[in-house]
Design a protein with these regions (language model features):
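Conserved S-adenosyl-L-methionine
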Residues: 181-298
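Short conserved loop adjoining the S-adenosyl-L-methionine
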Residues: 295-311
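C-terminal edge-of-domain segments
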Residues: 146-163
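SAM-dependent methyltransferase catalytic-core segment centered on the flexible catalytic loop
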Residues: 223, 227-247, 306-317, 322-360
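Non-catalytic nucleic-acid substrate-recognition regions in nucleic-acid-modifying enzymes
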Residues: 1-142
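SAM-dependent Rossmann-like transferase core, predominantly class I methyltransferases
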Residues: 158-194
Length: 394
């Protein structure tokens, strides 16, 4: 089983897989084999595959590698895949299923992408027919998505996309905002910042579309993805990956009730974030506060907590501030400097502050106020090179 995420997230995905496997199905996973900077590979197990697709939040895809070949021409590619699929006696499809096939990273194969897709499609459909099942091509609404790609060694690997598409799409986003943070990357930030929903109050001072607050609540509770993903349901059902228990999957940490606060200076942005939270089922659980990020203070957080009958024990400031697309360098530096000053007000308390930013101006502004970060990690955000910074404020 191949778990795929953004670059530089191998360690995070491994940690999440171990936690999910232990909580959801009561097993310890072996140490994975890492491939590149954004993929981990573990032996395929049906219950583990179900748990990964249902509960993991940091990957973009979960794949089941079912065949591979060193073929360098279309004819042997067809022959090798057909042979592997005929010899594999596991459930790989259901009679009558629609499939789609896509080719990725096949630039070094001596044939065009469409030729590769057609060859792979023929091998799958022919193998299914010889095993007693009839499949048909349905690129728009497939039950199973098949992916053929060349790995780092030049081998062609054929996989089934167990999630039925991108796992980053949770199904709740109605308003994206001007510079949305992808959902899986928000989950990565929460892991890197060591968010503990049992005791941490989370504050996003520039919440935008609300991705971080929404993801904090879902990740904190271990909310299953499946109810909002018909593609994942169809794929899991077709492969007989139904999990160890009957009935719909339950949250892994149902009693988790973290205090989560989303702030923004723009009322329209806050309204859009609230709409997204409504679609995600957490609109009544996120506290939305109109506030300039530079005015954030412990007193504001304490007042909000008191209104909710909560106590602030420790906290995490986590945000995806602007990178400068609509601000000149002077204004951007001033914004970052004001944000750093706001974080400094939490000094002496058990708080941390984490940010994903794509400009060196951020580190310069924060260094003048808070010094060096405890963690500086490269990450990619929407194909932009960025860094995650974590500051210890206590």
């Amino acid at each position: 089983m191949r778990i795929v995420g953004s670059s530089q997230t191998n360690v995070v995905m491994d940690a999440e897989l171990k936690r999910v496997a232990q909580r959801a199905i009561g097993v310890r996973t072996p140490n994975p084999r890492k491939e590149g900077l954004g993929q981990i590979i573990v032996p395929f197990d049906r219950d583990l595959a179900w748990a990964a697709v249902t509960y993991m939040r940091t990957p973009t895809r979960v794949l089941w590698d079912v065949a591979r070949t060193t073929a360098e021409r279309l004819e042997p590619l067809y022959d090798d895949l057909l042979r592997d699929l005929l010899e594999d006696k596991r459930t790989l499809w259901r009679d009558g299923d629609g499939i789609s096939v896509e080719a990725r990273h096949v630039e070094n194969f001596p044939a065009g992408e469409r030729q590769i897709v057609g060859t792979v499609k023929n091998a799958i459909i022919d193998a299914a027919r010889r095993r007693g099942a009839t499949l048909h091509l349905d690129p728009d609404r497939p039950t199973l998505r098949w992916i053929a790609r060349q790995d780092d060694r030049g081998e062609m690997v054929l996989s089934i996309d167990l999630g039925g598409g991108s796992l980053s799409q949770r199904g709740w986003r109605r308003e994206a905002g001007e510079a949305p943070l992808r959902e899986h990357l928000a989950a990565v930030l929460l892991m890197l910042a060591r968010f503990d929903p049992r005791k941490d109050t989370l504050v996003d001072p520039m919440c935008g579309a609300g991705t971080i607050p929404i993801e904090a609540l879902h990740a904190g509770r271990g909310v299953p993805r499946t109810p909002s993903s018909p593609q994942a349901r169809a794929a899991l059902k077709a492969l007989g990956l139904n999990g160890p228990k009957s009935g719909p999957p339950e949250p892994l940490f149902a009693d988790s009730q973290p205090l989560v606060i989303g702030c923004d200076v723009d009322l329209g942005v806050l309204g859009a974030a609230r709409d997204n939270a409504y679609e995600a089922g957490v609109d009544k659980e996120v506290v939305w506060q109109r506030a300039d990020a530079r005015s954030l203070s412990p007193a504001l957080v304490t007042d909000i907590a008191r209104e909710k009958g909560r106590e602030v024990r420790s906290g995490l400031i986590l945000s995806n501030p602007p990178y400068g697309e609509r601000l000149d360098d002077e204004d951007l530096y001033g914004l970052y400097r004001g944000l750093a000053e706001a974080c400094r007000r939490f000094r002496g308390q058990p708080w941390r502050a984490g940010f994903i930013v794509g400009t060196p101006l951020f580190e310069e502004a924060f260094f003048d106020v808070l010094g060096r970060p405890r963690i500086k990690k490269p990450l990619a955000n929407a194909n932009l090179r960025a860094y995650f910074y974590l500051y210890e404020l206590q």
